[in-house]
From Swiss-Prot:
Underlying gene: nuoK
Protein name, as recorded: NADH-quinone oxidoreductase subunit K
Gene Ontology process terms (BP): ATP synthesis coupled electron transport
Signal peptide: none
The organism's taxonomic lineage, starting at the top: Bacteria, Bacillati, Bacillota, Bacilli, Bacillales
Pfam families recorded: Oxidored_q2
Amino acid sequence: MNSVPASAYLTLAIILFCIGLFGALTKRNTVIVLVCMELMLNAANLNLVAFSKLGFFPNLTGQIFSLFTMSVAAAEAAVGLAILIALYRNRTTVNIDEMDKLKG
């Protein structure tokens, strides 16, 4: 049975990371920026799993670290969305350009 080569995983991870980076740098909506940052983090997780499974010395360390990173990312997304909801209630917008002032 043939396995998918490591270059396919790495290419997919690079494409996902570049899409996330482009979205995070060009979009003005805070929710979209958070989603793009999660996409970049998932690309890094894909690299961890690919190197763990197809690396020179395959072991489970990269996969376990990827699961840990996913749980931290879920907590980060929850906190980020909670802060975003609080800012929306205060400013009535989620546009990044409008959130440059610290005082109300």
